[in-house]
């Protein structure tokens, strides 16, 4: 309920739902956070959710010794709104376009690092800028992207090969067919409604590596979740 519910209320509710269903957790407390012109505002705290907030959820569940890692994006509608502002939708669409390239180009390789470079060649050819974590460029005409695909399965962040900046050693592992990975990215797109500050859109869902690219393990979400 806008104006009443806090971020930690949502996080605890999600945890309760996991326990009720007999599911484990990949990361203990889910991360429920708000993103604004200054970046991440608050995470799973007593911050009250307001209309116009852009919400992100990062969590994972466990079942039969299999663990997931996923993200979702939601927007709290203002009075009279029936959809997210066009600038936020554009930022989300840019993130989807970047993810589509990742999905098509991540394939088995001698090392995960080799697969990463092939993927980035395609991403940059598609007009996306390679950025450092949470350090987007000042160029309002480009969408900056940070990628973090990593293994999943035995845990939310698994023990296998990784294309993520935070697992440099695992970039040296062979990326084989059948490897389970999360397709994770953060896309930063300029938002005129925020004075040109860039919107941080995180996307993450789980997939299996094949010779055709990667295939989703389940139907993935392709829209901003609208909260009334």
Whereabouts are the PLM-identified features?
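Active-site neighborhoods and metal-handling regions in enzymes and metal-associated proteins
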Residues: 1-228
């Amino acid at each position: 309920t806008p104006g009443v519910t806090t971020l930690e209320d949502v996080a605890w509710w999600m945890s309760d739902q996991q326990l009720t269903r007999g599911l484990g957790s990949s990361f203990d407390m889910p991360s429920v956070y708000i993103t604004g012109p200054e970046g991440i505002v608050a995470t799973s705290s007593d911050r009250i959710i307001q209309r116009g907030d852009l919400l992100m959820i990062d969590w994972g569940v466990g079942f039969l010794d299999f663990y997931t890692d996923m993200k979702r994006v939601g927007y709290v509608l203002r009075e009279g709104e029936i959809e997210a502002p066009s600038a936020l939708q554009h930022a989300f669409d840019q993130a989807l376009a970047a993810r589509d390239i990742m999905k098509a180009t991540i394939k088995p390789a001698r090392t995960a690092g080799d697969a990463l470079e092939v993927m980035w060649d395609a991403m940059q050819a598609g007009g996306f800028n390679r950025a450092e974590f949470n350090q987007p460029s000042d160029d309002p005409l480009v969408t900056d992207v940070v990628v973090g695909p990593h293994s999943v399965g035995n845990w939310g962040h698994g023990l296998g090969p990784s294309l993520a900046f935070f697992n440099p050693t695992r970039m040296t592992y062979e990326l084989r067919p059948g490897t389970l990975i999360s397709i994770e990215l953060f896309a930063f797109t300029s938002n005129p409604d925020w004075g040109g500050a860039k919107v941080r859109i995180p996307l993450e869902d789980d997939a299996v590596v094949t010779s055709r690219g990667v295939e989703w393990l389940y139907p993935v979400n392709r829209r901003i979740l609208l909260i009334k």
